[in-house]
């Protein structure tokens, strides 16, 4: 919840109630899905284990059953597929050597094909259950490993295929294997569980309910090879991921201490997945944000904003951005870590998504108190924001508009005047012609806050002249506001009409400017205008 000071300040100090604190400090709202929930090429939720050529050669040489892969083409094929009748016979034999050989052949099929025959494998009666049975063979760690690999690759498929693995009872056994004496088996179990948890929120919750976290976290206390650490932190991030619904926080929060030291591992993949996990955990109400802060990760997250790999920067920025959606005190923790200089640097990133997310983060800082707005001013960030507002891609301009309008809503007279002197009026006026109604409202609110300040100045100096009216007219803002009186959105045309009437109206003005009123429908009547997709050009 927001601090009482911020709440009272927003609601009492301004007539503009349309920008309430919840809007100003926006969480990951639905309209911003392309920003907040964008598909990330950098992070895969499922991974298929594919053997390297070197591994295949070694395995063929060491094959226990005397069946080399080159012989597959000479075997009798099961009707309509790549699974041979010999493979099926061997998998159900009582010979451990034949069981292992057949399992390796299944694994190779599921590892090497561009489109692995997962459906054919799971539709072969009894095969998946047989692999799950092999997971229990503690006396044969090689068979455990190979069957775990097969099941991992089945679980890398679609949700139906993953569900087959779950229904066969594999998850509790995989969790037991996290404590195996053999690191290969442990690692393959981690991989399988990561794939299952990454399938859906339902699968994630099932894996959590099976009590995966204690043995998974125990893995990090050992000196592991790098691939084990990578797989384990990736699985951990999948356990923290998801919003509809999010995981039960009490079940995932114990991982915070581990994540805090994983941020100091040098490996890029480990860093990236640790940051993603923290971004998921901080994406929620303030009590979750506080738990992340209490884990002591903020300073390191801010440091990682300057990492040389975007694979790390992107999730670190997401986590920092989530933390500043909290209250003023939580936001201040990030500011105290010298985040603004890093954010200023990211505003010039060649990667548009980074620039956009940096603007979003700053917009939540400018929704804070006046001292926090001043720190943004002192960091010389607003000139960069105004430049973005004029030249960047539209989705990034939207975030910059929020940052500037939030500052005009909560800023002092001197702070708002500073923004005007930087030239914020024209780019705000330019946004009045876009098709995105929410951003038109944001721009109107920013201009209204500026006009309100001008009215106060006019009264104070006795001239009666609002100095900002002329600046808005010079930027063709008045023409655009007048045009918005025929906007299809009721809030926009009402706001436009009110601004014209209050700040630009004259006593002898033509009354035809005011819209007609339909007394029966209790609404204004406007002519309908067709708008070009890129916005009106005035």
From Swiss-Prot:
It is found in: Cytoplasm; Nucleus. Residues 318-406 are annotated as: NLS binding site (minor). GO terms for biological process: NLS-bearing protein import into nucleus; postsynapse to nucleus signaling pathway; protein import into nucleus; regulation of apoptotic process; regulation of canonical Wnt signaling pathway; regulation of DNA recombination; satellite cell activation involved in skeletal muscle regeneration; skeletal muscle satellite cell proliferation. SUPFAM superfamilies: ARM repeat (SSF48371). Consists of an N-terminal hydrophilic region, a hydrophobic central region composed of 10 repeats, and a short hydrophilic C-terminus. The N-terminal hydrophilic region contains the importin beta binding domain (IBB domain), which is sufficient for binding importin beta and essential for nuclear protein import. The IBB domain is thought to act as an intrasteric autoregulatory sequence by interacting with the internal autoinhibitory NLS. Binding of KPNB1 probably overlaps the internal NLS and contributes to a high affinity for cytoplasmic NLS-containing cargo substrates. After dissociation of the importin/substrate complex in the nucleus the internal autohibitory NLS contributes to a low affinity for nuclear NLS-containing proteins. Belongs to the importin alpha family. Functions in nuclear protein import as an adapter protein for nuclear receptor KPNB1. Binds specifically and directly to substrates containing either a simple or bipartite NLS motif. Docking of the importin/substrate complex to the nuclear pore complex (NPC) is mediated by KPNB1 through binding to nucleoporin FxFG repeats and the complex is subsequently translocated through the pore by an energy requiring, Ran-dependent mechanism. This is Importin subunit alpha-5. It comes from Homo sapiens (Human). The gene is KPNA1.
